[in-house]
């Protein structure tokens, strides 16, 4: 029997008198086939260390611990720590850290792996309400995670992996794809969770690029430009950029020069630009002193 078997999950919750907290976005997966598929997608073996976020009662952790060198699981809910100590008692390669992943010094914890030089993968069922902040926090942490295989709301997975000229494409797609390749591996129906969420989930596989997707003069400025270009999706690039940089004649002249340098027309929409075009635009705007 597995932790994720529905009857076992119910028994664990009842034995510990656990009640779900909506503020933590808790939905526990009760399908062992999907858990195995997650581990297979992440290609976990004994030469890999794993960071897990939000282990819950340990359903995914159990599968990870069986396959990985070590698992470090970050759980914000104190009430789950004794439950995890119970459900994972047979594993000596799991460390549960009762902390908010957004507030810890990750490098310090990673140094505590028995073999910190092994590749580190992030495998997690992320809370819906905080998926994007967690992902960007990890991606921008400077820690060279080799791969992320994470479950999230299907809509968010679609946005992250979206390509130009699609409805889902936006600044989040660019922010992630600058650092990583992103592809939806498979869909997880809402019916396999306790309690069932209102929407379906997706497993997103992201692999770190050896170098960022494009070369830019100023990364921070590049991301500011991409965000500004999608503030009003139905507006043209020109309208979004003048809203962000200003509408004085001097600014307009600089914007016109930058668009010409980047080989872009003013009435194009942000969703039509790929990372290469945004890199050209960002560098051109920078060269105009904007």
From Swiss-Prot:
GO cellular component, one term: cytosol
Gene transcribed to yield this protein: rsmA
EC code(s) of this entry: 2.1.1.182
The protein's role, per its UniProt record: Specifically dimethylates two adjacent adenosines (A1518 and A1519) in the loop of a conserved hairpin near the 3'-end of 16S rRNA in the 30S particle. May play a critical role in biogenesis of 30S subunits.
Organism: Streptococcus gordonii (strain Challis / ATCC 35105 / BCRC 15272 / CH1 / DL1 / V288)
Compartments, record wording: Cytoplasm
InterPro entries in alphabetical order: KsgA/Erm, rRNA_Ade_diMease-like_C, rRNA_Ade_Mease_Trfase_CS, rRNA_Ade_methylase_Trfase_N, rRNA_adenine_dimethylase, SAM-dependent_MTases_sf
Assigned protein family: Belongs to the class I-like SAM-binding methyltransferase superfamily. rRNA adenine N(6)-methyltransferase family. RsmA subfamily.
Identification of the protein by name: Ribosomal RNA small subunit methyltransferase A
Keyword Cytoplasm part of the UniProt annotation: yes
Major location (coarse): cytoplasm
Keywords: Cytoplasm, Methyltransferase, RNA-binding, rRNA processing, S-adenosyl-L-methionine, Transferase
Reactions listed under catalytic activity: adenosine(1518)/adenosine(1519) in 16S rRNA + 4 S-adenosyl-L-methionine = N(6)-dimethyladenosine(1518)/N(6)-dimethyladenosine(1519) in 16S rRNA + 4 S-adenosyl-L-homocysteine + 4 H(+)
Lineage top rank: taxon: Bacteria
MF terms in GO: 16S rRNA (adenine(1518)-N(6)/adenine(1519)-N(6))-dimethyltransferase activity; RNA binding
Main enzyme class: transferase
PROSITE patterns membership: RRNA_A_DIMETH (PS01131), SAM_RNA_A_N6_MT (PS51689)
Binding positions for S-adenosyl-L-methionine per the UniProt entry: 27, 29, 54, 75, 100, 125
């Amino acid at each position: 029997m597995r932790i994720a078997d529905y009857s076992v999950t119910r028994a664990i919750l009842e034995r510990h008198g656990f009640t779900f907290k909506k503020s933590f976005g808790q939905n526990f997966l009760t399908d062992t086939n999907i858990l195995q598929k997650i581990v297979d997608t992440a290609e976990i073996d004994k030469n890999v260390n794993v960071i897990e976020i939000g282990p819950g009662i340990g359903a995914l952790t159990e599968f990870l611990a069986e396959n990985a060198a070590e698992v470090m699981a970050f759980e914000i809910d104190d009430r789950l720590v004794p439950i995890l100590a119970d459900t994972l008692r047979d594993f000596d390669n799991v460390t549960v850290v009762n902390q908010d992943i957004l507030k810890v010094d990750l490098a310090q914890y990673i140094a505590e792996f028995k073999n910190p030089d092994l590749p580190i993968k992030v495998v997690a069922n992320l809370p819906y309400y905080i998926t994007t902040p967690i992902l960007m926090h990890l991606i921008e942490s400077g820690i060279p995670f080799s791969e992320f295989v994470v479950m999230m709301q299907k809509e968010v997975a679609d946005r992250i992996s979206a390509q130009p000229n699609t409805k889902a494409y936006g600044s989040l797609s660019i922010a992630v794809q600058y650092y990583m390749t992103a592809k939806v591996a498979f869909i997880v129906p809402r019916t396999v969770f306790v309690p069932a969420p209102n929407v379906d989930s997706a497993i997103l596989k992201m692999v770190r690029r050896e170098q960022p997707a494009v070369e830019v003069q100023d990364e921070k400025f590049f991301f500011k430009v991409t965000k500004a270009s999608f503030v009003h999706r139905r507006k043209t690039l020109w309208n979004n950029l003048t809203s962000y940089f200003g509408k004085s004649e001097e600014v307009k002249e600089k914007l016109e020069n930058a668009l010409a340098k980047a080989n872009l027309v003013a009435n194009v929409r942000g969703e039509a630009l790929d990372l290469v075009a945004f890199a050209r635009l960002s560098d051109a705007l920078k060269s105009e002193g904007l």
